[in-house]
A protein has these predicted regions:
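Active-site-adjacent structural elements that line small-molecule/cofactor binding pockets in enzymes
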Residues: 1-212
């Protein structure tokens, strides 16, 4: 991503996704802020709690507490990025006043919360800026987004500011359904090179982008 940041000037960059509870939050804060700084404030931070127990076992991180750990790490990151001398005392991360540099270029790095459970919807509503479930039936996406906005309102946040992103195979009819459902951004997963030219040529034709 650092290479992509250096080689571009306008596209936004996003992690999709960073398994946050597997990271040291103080180191992650510096790495993420550095990337946002060198990109000129173009980073969206996609995070998730993880699902593969063996990864957590290999790292010595308790699998069962990954959700609570993620929530606390998010709170710690916000403190490290916003305070000149940051201090945080929690169950999973605890540090006395420290200086954490560099600070992000953006005043607030957008947090994309991945997942498709009710708990993920709650995390997005309470702590995130974007809810980013993987491709699901449109009705499921609408239900999850509604739940995320409910949790945002309960947390004293503006529910209208919780965006909904998802992924798609790029089928034009599916994309139209997502737009109608209020999805603001769609990720079309990468494919083998031999498939890309044909697929994107079809998308260009479907959306009349030849002269765009």
């Amino acid at each position: 991503m650092a290479f992509a940041a250096a080689a571009t000037s306008t596209i936004r960059l996003a992690t999709g996704i960073l398994i946050l509870p597997q990271r040291n939050p103080l180191i992650a804060a510096k790495e993420i802020a550095s990337l946002d700084r060198i990109s000129g404030g173009r980073l969206d931070l996609g995070i998730g709690v993880g699902w593969l127990r063996e990864e957590f076992d290999a790292l010595g991180v308790p699998f069962e507490a990954r959700g609570a750990r993620t929530d606390e790490y998010l709170a710690a990151l916000r403190v490290l990025w916003s305070e000149s001398e940051a201090e945080f005392h929690g169950e999973f991360v605890d540090f006395d006043p420290v200086y954490c540099q560099p600070k992000p270029a953006q005043q607030r790095i957008p947090i994309l919360v991945g997942g498709h459970s009710n708990r993920a919807a709650q995390r997005a509503g309470e702590l995130g800026d974007v809810f980013f479930p993987a491709e699901r039936p449109v009705e499921t996406l609408l239900s999850l987004h509604s739940l995320a906005k409910e949790f945002a309102e309960k947390a004293g946040r503006d529910p209208a500011k919780i965006e909904l992103w998802t992924s798609s195979n790029g089928d034009s009819s599916h994309l139209d359904q997502l737009v109608e459902a209020g999805v603001s951004q769609v990720m079309v997963p990468a494919r083998p090179p031999e498939q890309l030219a044909e697929r994107y040529a079809q998308l260009i034709a479907d959306y009349d982008l030849e002269d765009a």
